[in-house]
Amino acid sequence: MFELLLHAFPVAFALASFWSNTERKLLLMNLGLCIAIGSLLVFEQAWGGAVVITVAGLSTSYRLIKQKLLSPVATYITLISMMVIVLTVNNLTGKTSLVEAMPVLTFMAYRFGELHCKEAGLRVCMIIGSINFTAYGIITQTWGLAITEALFAASNLWYYMKLRRAM
């Protein structure tokens, strides 16, 4: 029953993301997803994904608190530093396959969007990251993650299309 709840909690956040019509709501929803998916990945012992999600939650928190974008240089330094942390943990745990690197690719797309892009760019980065993380969830048979990320990609695509029409 507990495992079912861990899989359902992120899906509930993903469904709620269809009401994240502003950048702030999107970031708050992403923070909630980080907590929910992080808990699920720890339970599933998918440590690479869990580390990625933890660092992602910190990045999302920074953007919510500061409410400003980083300069290009600061963005790249931050991304590289975070990527090194995640890849180091993967290496220490012996998780060095391409599948274990997929969360890092998602992480890079999400963090670039959060730290450097305004709403439209942020949504594009989240669409790309969510599609990749959906594939990771399917490959690792973490179904709550796969469904969540597919829904999150769909909601971001919906709002991105609305933004493009408004421009």
Cite the ranges covered by each PLM segment.
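Alpha-helical membrane-protein topology signature
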Residues: 1-167
